[in-house]
Amino acid sequence: MASESGKLWGGRFAGSVDPTMDKFNSSIAYDRHLWNVDLQGSKAYSRGLEKAGLLTKAEMQQILQGLDKVAEEWAQGIFKLYPNDEDIHTANERRLKELIGEAAGKLHTGRSRNDQVVTDLRLWMRQTYSKLSTFLKVLIEAMVDRAEAECEVLFPGYTHLQRAQPIRWSHWILSHAVALTRDLERLKEVQKRINVLPLGSGAIAGNPLGVDREFLCAELNFGAITLNSMDATSERDFVAEFLFWASLCMTHLSRMAEDLILYGTKEFNFVQLSDAYSTGSSLMPQKKNPDSLELIRSKARRVFGRCAGLLMTLKGLPSTYNKDLQEDKEAVFEVSDTMTAVLQVATGVISTLQIHRENMAQALSPDMLATDLAYYLVRKGMPFRQAHEASGKAVVVAEMKGVALNQLSLQELQTVSPLFSSDVNLVWDYSHSVEQYTALGGTAQSSVEWQISQVRALLQM
C-alpha cells in the first residue's frame, strides 16, 4: 500500500520530499508513453500471481477488469494525473486502487518497478520495431521501384567529389538501398534481443513466491526469459543496440541526403525536389530550399547524441538498477519519433524526385573514360600497371593539345602505345562503357537488374 505521502516507497520515510526534488525525480512527463504496455504487463503478472496461488480467481478478475477500465480512460484521454504520480507505474496503480480498492495492493506482490519498467520498455520497443521495420521497407521499395524504372539513365559517378566514371543512375540509387537493407537486417537482430522477458526478476534477487516466469513469457509472447535477475533489471544493451542501429541508419540516410542536396544545386542540376518536400526563402523569392534533406542530415546528429549519451550513462554504473537508467526512455522515445519522421520524409522525397536526364547526360565527359582506355589496352594483352600509365600519358597529351581525350587521333594514341587500333573508337561510347561492368554488383544493366532482384528478395525475408 502507498504511504500517506502517496509514494509507493514512502513507508520508510518520516519527512516529505522537497518539491524541487519531487519534480526532478519524476518521469511521468515522458514515461506516460508506456501506459498501454504497463497495463499489458500488469495483466499478465496478475494471471501469474493467480497461477502461483497468490491471488484468488475472483481477485484476479477484479484486477483485470480494473486494468481494462484504466486502459479505457487512457484511450479516451480522460485519465487524470496527479502530482504524486511520479511515474507511469505509480499512476496506473493509484488509479486501479481508486477503482477496485484494496485488491489493487496485491498486484505488485513480488514485483519491483525495476523489472516492471524494463519489461514495459521492451514491450514498447517491440511495437516500435514493427513500425520502423515497415517504414524502412517502404523506403527501400520506393528506391528499388525507381531504380527499375530509370535503369537506362546514365550520369557521372563521383569519387572525392570529382567526376570518376559513367554509371547508371539506378546504380547510385541501389548503392543507398543496399545500405538500408543492412539496416533492416540489423533491426531484426536487435528485435531478437529486445524480445527477452525480465519480468519476475524482482528488484535484484529474483522472485521468492513461486511465480512461473515461463508462463509470463508465454502470456506476453516473448521469445525467451532473461537468465540472471541482477542482469535483467539493469542491462540496457538492447537500448544501446537500438540507438546504435538508428545512428547507423541515419548515417546512411544523411549521406544519401547530402548527395541529393548537391545534385539539386544549379551547379549540378541533376535532380529537382518536389514542392511538397521543399521550402522557400522569406527574402529571396527565387529560392527553393531542400529543407527536407537538410533536416534529415541534421537530425542524424541528434540520434548520435542520444546513443553516445546512453553509453556514457551505462559505462559508469555499479551493478544492478540505478536511477540513472530512468534516462533511457527519453532517448528511446525521441529516437523512435525521429526515425519515424525521417523514414517517411525520405520515402516522399525519393518517390516524388524529378531527374534531369539531359543534364546528367551532358555532364558525362570523355576524360571519365580514361580507365576504359586502360582496360582497352589490358584486353590487348598489356599488364594493367603499364596500361594505366599509358592511359595517363594519353590524358597528358590531350591536355597539352587542349582537346578532349576522345579527340586524339589514332596516330597520336599510337605514340603512347602501338596497341591502339581503329576499334579504340568503341571506348568513347558511354553506353558501351557501363555495359562492360557485368560482374555481379557492377553498373551493367544485367548486374543492376540482378541487384534489384536481390534487394526485392531481401524485402520478402
Swiss-Prot record:
PTM section of the record: Acetylation modifies enzyme activity in response to alterations of extracellular nutrient availability. Acetylation increased with trichostin A (TSA) or with nicotinamide (NAM). Glucose increases acetylation by about a factor of 3 with decreasing enzyme activity. Acetylation on Lys-288 is decreased on the addition of extra amino acids resulting in activation of enzyme activity.
UniProt modified residues of type N-acetylalanine: 2
Residues recorded with modification N6-acetyllysine: 7, 69, 288
EC number, as in UniProt: 4.3.2.1
Any coiled-coil regions, as ranges: none
Activity regulation as described: Enzyme activity is regulated by acetylation.
Active site as annotated: 160 (proton acceptor), 281 (proton donor)
Reaction equation(s) it catalyzes: 2-(N(omega)-L-arginino)succinate = fumarate + L-arginine
Pathways involved: Amino-acid biosynthesis; L-arginine biosynthesis; L-arginine from L-ornithine and carbamoyl phosphate: step 3/3; Nitrogen metabolism; urea cycle; L-arginine and fumarate from (N(omega)-L-arginino)succinate: step 1/1
Entry's Gene Ontology BP terms: amino acid metabolic process; ammonia assimilation cycle; arginine biosynthetic process via ornithine; arginine metabolic process; argininosuccinate metabolic process; cellular response to ammonium ion; cellular response to cAMP; cellular response to dexamethasone stimulus
Record key words, sorted: Acetylation, Amino-acid biosynthesis, Arginine biosynthesis, Lyase, Urea cycle
Binding residues annotated for 2-(N(omega)-L-arginino)succinate, in chain numbering: 27, 114, 159, 289, 321, 326, 329
Site (Increases basicity of active site His): 294
Keyword Acetylation in record: yes
Subunit structure: Homotetramer. Forms tissue-specific complexes with ASS1, SLC7A1, HSP90AA1 and nitric oxide synthase NOS1, NOS2 or NOS3; the complex maintenance is independent of ASL catalytic function.
Main function: Catalyzes the reversible cleavage of L-argininosuccinate to fumarate and L-arginine, an intermediate step reaction in the urea cycle mostly providing for hepatic nitrogen detoxification into excretable urea as well as de novo L-arginine synthesis in nonhepatic tissues. Essential regulator of intracellular and extracellular L-arginine pools.
Family membership: Belongs to the lyase 1 family. Argininosuccinate lyase subfamily.
Matches recorded under HAMAP family: Arg_succ_lyase
Record-given protein name: Argininosuccinate lyase
Native source species: Rattus norvegicus (Rat)
Gene that specifies this protein: Asl
